[in-house]
Amino acid sequence: LSVTYDGWIDLFCWGTGNCPTKVSTDIFSPDTAFVNFVDWGINQIGNDKPNTWRTLTNEEWNYLTDGKEGRKNADSLCSVAQVDGINGFILLPDNWTCPSNVSFKRGVAVGHSEKNYAEHQIITLENWLVLEESGAIFLPVTEDNMYSYGNENSEGYYWSSTLKGKYSPHVYAYYFEFDASYAGCMFNSTSKRLFVRLVKDVK
């Protein structure tokens, strides 16, 4: 993604891997609400075979970002930034070491608005490519239908593969959310349209 990108960025209702255009009415009924998760990785992605990629579980998202439930140094293995003009959240591998030829500020910003990403740090595309090579992952802020106010440049929402439960008249699933000063897992209706970020298991 970059400020000049003008292609499609898709949002999905939960678990619609085999039917990405389907929209749940979110009524407690097996016919209309999403209960059985179908991973988006069921599709062929690039030259990889179907089911090579998958969606992170709620437990995995928590491991990455929650120092109480996951890795103890989670707070120092994440950051926020404006990367090549795009606001977003950065995840770092366990035992990560910053490359010597770039500067990097760990942790999140003090404020939670759009401007706080750039105030925390600005990373050029050249430097980001170095960080990416070292294992850093960038999650751009997202558009969504979660709330009515505009947050397309300040917050991010990414589905997990974990169902929360059926509480009539709603069906809920977990998702990962962030702004410039916060990151964590929440749950909401499976009818919400959010981003997905797939991963590949290391063998």
Which role fits each region the language model picked out?
Residues 1-37, 51-65:
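A short glycine-rich, aromatic-capped structural motif
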